């Protein structure tokens, strides 16, 4: 049974790091899950992987959760195969994807999740759980082998979702860019996941944690604003065609 906790962001303004996600991770991870938690830190750009691991451990220490950076292992594929839980941190989705592909991590992580190993990611870490990275907000500062990512879910997430442009902004809005995506890929749902929101997926059940609505996009349909208490099960249905263009 797949077990996923997909988080929009690590912290909102005025919050400490993983303030909202920490309690959810505590509920999400069993005692057995905590034996060997691997953190994939490759989205970090302006700070070191060691600093990233330290920051995550400091935030999760009150919950008795300790992570081990994947970068510290000589054989990262073997480390993934031995993991009891996998966390993928935020940062730049393009760099994260390129590094995961180069190290041959996509299939081992996919296999681990299919075997029931819990997976949680925030921001870029939720992006790579999708079929592709096409709905990331990040600048493409690295070139991956392809846009294909883990495909742990059949829909796309846009984390840090904002439906309104900042005051004085004259460029494309997030809303317009996602409409472009679903126009080009009409069978793929996109969930605009506002900050402070998380998807919890266990098997064929999905729910939203957080107070904010989720905006749903689908080709040829009006966008929908759905309350966190809504039925999101349709997002887990496989699209009628195999994958996005």
Regions from the PLM with identified roles:
Residues 81-82, 115, 152:
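Alpha-helix C-terminal capping/helix-to-coil transition sites in glycosyltransferase folds
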Residues 1-34, 40, 47-51, 135, ...:
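C-terminal and late-domain segments of enzyme folds
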Residues 1, 16-19, 27, 61-82, ...:
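N-terminal glycine-/serine-/threonine-rich phosphate-binding loop
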Residues 87-90, 113-132:
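Catalytic nucleophile loop
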Residues 38-39, 43-101:
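Portal/gating segments that form or line small-molecule/metal binding sites
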Residues 46, 93-94, 126-129, 198-200:
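Short, active-site-adjacent cap segments at secondary-structure transitions
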Residues 102-116:
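Catalytic-core regions built around general acid/base machinery
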Residues 6, 38, 85-89, 120, ...:
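Structural motif
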């Amino acid at each position: 049974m797949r077990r996923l906790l997909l988080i929009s962001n690590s912290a909102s303004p005025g919050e400490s790091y993983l303030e909202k996600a920490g309690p959810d991770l505590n509920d999400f991870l069993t005692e057995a899950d905590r034996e060997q938690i691997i953190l994939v830190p490759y989205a970090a750009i302006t700070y070191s992987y060691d600093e990233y691991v330290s920051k995550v451990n400091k935030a999760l220490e009150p919950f008795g959760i300790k992570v081990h950076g994947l970068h510290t292992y000589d054989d990262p594929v073997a480390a993934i195969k031995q993991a009891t839980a996998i966390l993928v941190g935020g940062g730049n989705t393009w760099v994260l994807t390129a590094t995961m592909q180069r190290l041959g991590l996509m299939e081992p992580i996919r296999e681990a999740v299919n075997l029931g190993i819990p997976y949680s990611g925030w921001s870029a870490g939720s992006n790579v759980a999708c079929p592709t990275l096409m709905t990331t907000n990040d600048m493409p500062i690295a070139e991956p082998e392809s846009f294909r990512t883990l495909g742990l879910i059949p829909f796309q997430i846009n984390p840090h979702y904002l439906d309104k442009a900042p005051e004085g902004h004259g460029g494309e809005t997030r809303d317009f860019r996602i409409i472009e995506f679903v126009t080009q890929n009409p069978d793929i749902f996109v969930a605009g996941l506002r900050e402070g929101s998380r998807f919890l997926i266990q098997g064929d059940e999905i729910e939203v944690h957080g107070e904010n609505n989720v905006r749903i996009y689908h080709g040829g349909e009006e966008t929908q604003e759905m309350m966190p208490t809504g039925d999101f099960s349709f997002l887990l249905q496989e699209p009628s065609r195999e994958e996005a263009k």
